[in-house]
Amino acid sequence: MQISVESVNSIKKKLNFEIPADKVSAEVDKAYAEIRKHAAIKGFRKGKVPMSLIEKHYGEKMAEDVVKNLVQESYFSAVSEQGLNPVGYPAIESNPLKKGESFKYSATVEVFPEVEVKDYTGLAVVKEKLEIDDSVVAARLKEMQERMSQLGPAPEGHAAAMGDFVTFDFKGAMDGVYFEGGSAEDFQLELGSGRFIPGFEEQMVGMTVGTNSTIKVNFPEGYGNADLAGKPADFEVSIKEIKVKELPELNDDFAKEFGEEFETLDLLKAKLAEMNEAQEVSRINAELRDRLIKALIEKNELEVPEALVDRQAQMMLESTKQRLASQRLSLEMMGMTDDSYKAQFRDNAREQVKGSLLLDAVAEKEKIEPTEEEFEAQLSVIAEQTRQDLEKVTQLYKTNERAKDNLMAQMREDKAVQFILDRAKVTEVPKAEIK
């Protein structure tokens, strides 16, 4: 068998094969013999069908089987012998199969790039300075108050305000004609929730129980009903009831509602401040990591296989869909499809692939590997984060080789990032100064 390898570019190879005629003939005979065992042709017993009839009825299938066998055997053998590291499946081009003649075909496949990483020490990056905003804790307490609030009747003469719950009747008309789906009775709406057409809720502010008024709005251009989209409408509104939120007082009793450990409001505030600081530190470090990897990529431009980019884009898509599902949302609700998402974030996927390849090269060059002790410690972190029993988590990762390999690969990458960060020139600056 003759094999030659062409470099289409740094990440794509073309393997050309010529398989000898005697090998082709042997495979053809073997394929016919196998088909003959099971061939069912009227007038002949299985295994006794003449070869001429088998060729007539099964010649096309035979050719497919032979080509498949020849390609599989020769391609994987050549990949191993040539020391190639393919990404994905090859694109096969071949001549027609003819018994008694050699079989020629080519296999074009993307391969992992040979990464010669450089200039990964002394990278200049900026890090956001940690600045604690006390208003965040106040805002969080306000959210907690809102969550524990109860609705009570508004005082007599109360003018509706944002945040109030208003019960009302409405009828919508266009050019004086009421339209289908534009009316309701005893409809309840929280002003400021954004559930109605833009401008509708704002015009209800200031109304009192018993008010009868007309609200003028324009349906958005992209409104779901094409008959209404972009058109003006008048809504007759009759206010029947207004309820206001009654917020619990911020005191020690309020704090105790969130756990026995919060005996005082100050303890609750301290915990919220601690959580906010931890979140800010995590965000700042994640953004620093992104800048560090971006700086590494700028020093080491490289081509990456499209198959790896496809794979990363698919992983990003699945992760996003899971996150949206946890929030009872979907891509469709965001106005996107699987394909449009992957197209929009393809460049991000490409940069992530570049970063992973470069970090892997740094780890290889610096002999960076997570230790067994670090692996055990990470299992404890996972157990704590997922609120699972440590023994259960340990069993999962020690019996699932793929899960363990993925975790070890992530830990290796994290250690490579830390190695580069320890040797980087990091400048802390206020958030406002970061571009």
Curated annotation (Swiss-Prot):
Gene3D superfamilies: 3.10.50.40, Trigger factor ribosome-binding domain, Trigger factor, C-terminal domain. GO terms for molecular function: peptidyl-prolyl cis-trans isomerase activity; protein folding chaperone; ribosome binding. It is an enzyme of class 5 (isomerase). It holds the Pfam family Trigger_C. Its EC number is 5.2.1.8. It catalyses: [protein]-peptidylproline (omega=180) = [protein]-peptidylproline (omega=0). Coiled coil: none annotated. Residues 163-248 form the PPIase FKBP-type domain. Consists of 3 domains; the N-terminus binds the ribosome, the middle domain has PPIase activity, while the C-terminus has intrinsic chaperone activity on its own. Belongs to the FKBP-type PPIase family. Tig subfamily. Involved in protein export. Acts as a chaperone by maintaining the newly synthesized protein in an open conformation. Functions as a peptidyl-prolyl cis-trans isomerase. This is Trigger factor. The lineage of its organism: Bacteria, Pseudomonadati, Thermodesulfobacteriota, Desulfuromonadia, Geobacterales.
